[in-house]
Amino acid sequence: MDEDLRERIEREAETAALFNALKHESDAQVGAILGPMMGENPDFRPHGDEIPGIISPVIERVNGLSDEEKRERLEELAPEKVEALAAEDEGDDRPLPELPNADAYDDVRMRLAPNPNGPWHVGHARMPAVIGTYKDRYDGWFCVRFDDTDPETKRPDLDAYGEILDAIDYLGFEPDEVVKASDRVETYYEYGRKLIKAGGAYTCSCDAESFSELKNNAEACPHRDKDIETTLSEFEAMIDGEYSAGEMVLRVRTDIEHKNPALRDWVAFRMVDTPHPREEAADYRCWPMLDFQSGIDDHEFGISHIIRGIDLQDSAKRQQFVYEYFDWEYPEVIHWGHVQIDAYDIEMSTSTIKQLIDDGELDDWDDPRAPTVASLKRRGIRGQAIVNAMVELGTSTSNVDLAMSSVYAENREFVDDEADRRFFVRDGVEKPLAGGPESASPPLHPNDEDRGRREIPVGDAVYVEPDDVPADGERVWLKGLGPVRHEDGAFVATDDDIEVVRDGAVDVVHWVPAQESVPLRLRTVDGDEAGHAEPGIETYDADDIVQFERIGFARIDRHDDEESVAYFAHP
């Protein structure tokens, strides 16, 4: 990273920290600063691993200033930010705005409506993060409703139901009710009948191409004026499975001349020949389309507020035709933009990830290379860290960027104090060692002397990382052990004191003893890295978090006969 870019990063961080601290009347936090800063400065993102270390001392310095000093400094750096502070609504500075017309409802009731066609990728975590946060804010209610009424195109995965509920639990939320739409098909049939009797629907046997041509020309199909009795009879025949896929649909009678063709006489029910994978729903052949099913359920469950993607604005408009036939009030709707997530080479797509697993390119949904919620959990990322980062994105209609470094910064706040420090050397180079102490005793945590120290036997050789081997005749400081000089392929202890490190003359590097180290495989987003950890790593239990010094945090996964395995969380 060049010096100009580093100075820009420090300046942006200082400005953001000053604004954040004054706005919230509290210390600025790395996690709250990092996400927006990376979103507003795309050229920072390639350096996401380095930036937390650069901005942490800047934020610490800002937090040490008085409010008056902060305001004066912000006036120097960004006077427009001072003006923005003055214009802030002092009543609410939370990233999520108040829900529209929340006071008009006895209860805030929301729904999370996943399609169970596979476990969740990282982007899916945004909805439960926001809905769960709103539930807590308003002491509200939310259900998980599995929208599983498409047995063919978005075929449900039987394992996904439980995996999605596990993901929600991992994120820290508990739904008040769990519903499968495929258990409610008879309810949708009953509302289909009611809609027909209200004059709001008709059966249509036009092929898709013919109807599309008529619709685009704002012309009614010949079945539109069919009488109610005939429509009811044909709908019952659909329910009884007397038609095959494509032979008959039930359409909502809207406005055939509506300026938006997508709203003209849309399909409410269609025939599907493929059986549903759930045994309880396998006999149904007449299935509701999502817009009909979802609209009915939102009313039946008393949903007050819906959050959905901005690309689904037509869904609300379609459903409002049904609501008008039944004289129902439509819920409040918040449309938000898409979230783009960096740090992954794999497309954020359930079908893509599933295909890579089937092809053997990924081990499973919790492979550290996979952009999935299960992967983040196995890597040791706390669910609350994901929630905090997602909530910071707000609910704007604009597309937003989530820098994974902001998730990592949030997680660092949770794990930094608890994680013991340990050494792990990747692809180690063995160097004989002459002289120096027989053992080293670095602290388990640099900020917690009461936690004690770990004893590392040295032996007569050590492993260091290839990039840490100095040129012949040069010195390094083996962390927790002391200074050595590289002479004729070996390390020889010297009597230098710590001043050579403070003066910048000697680098500090980590190491492990060659004889008593523990083989360890570190699984990362970029692939597996083999190496050796210091003795004692095998005493940690699965799910324990450690920090491999100069590398980052990792979750201990297991200890096999030949090696230990850990999953890399983040720097």
Swiss-Prot record:
Molecular functions per Gene Ontology: ATP binding; glutamate-tRNA ligase activity
Domain of life: Archaea
Reaction equations catalysed: tRNA(Glu) + L-glutamate + ATP = L-glutamyl-tRNA(Glu) + AMP + diphosphate
UniProt motif 'HIGH' region: location: 114-124
UniProt xrefs under PANTHER family: GLUTAMATE--TRNA LIGASE (PTHR43097:SF5), GLUTAMINE-TRNA LIGASE (PTHR43097)
Record flagged with keyword Aminoacyl-tRNA synthetase: yes
Listed EC numbers: 6.1.1.17
Transmembrane segments: none
Gene from which this protein is expressed: gltX
EC top class named in words: ligase
GO terms (BP aspect): amide biosynthetic process; glutamyl-tRNA aminoacylation
Keywords: Aminoacyl-tRNA synthetase, ATP-binding, Cytoplasm, Ligase, Nucleotide-binding, Protein biosynthesis
Protein name as annotated: Glutamate--tRNA ligase
InterPro entries associated with the record: Gln/Glu-tRNA_Ligase (IPR050132), Glu-tRNA-synth_arc/euk (IPR004526), Glu/Gln-tRNA-synth (IPR000924), Glu/Gln-tRNA-synth_Ib_cat-dom (IPR020058), Glu/Gln-tRNA-synth_Ib_codon-bd (IPR020059), Rbsml_bL25/Gln-tRNA_synth_N (IPR020056), Ribosomal_bL25/Gln-tRNA_synth (IPR011035), Rossmann-like_a/b/a_fold (IPR014729)
Native species: Natronomonas pharaonis (strain ATCC 35678 / DSM 2160 / CIP 103997 / JCM 8858 / NBRC 14720 / NCIMB 2260 / Gabara)
Residue ranges, annotated region (Disordered): 431-453
Coiled coil: none
Cellular compartment(s): Cytoplasm
Family according to the record: Belongs to the class-I aminoacyl-tRNA synthetase family. Glutamate--tRNA ligase type 2 subfamily.
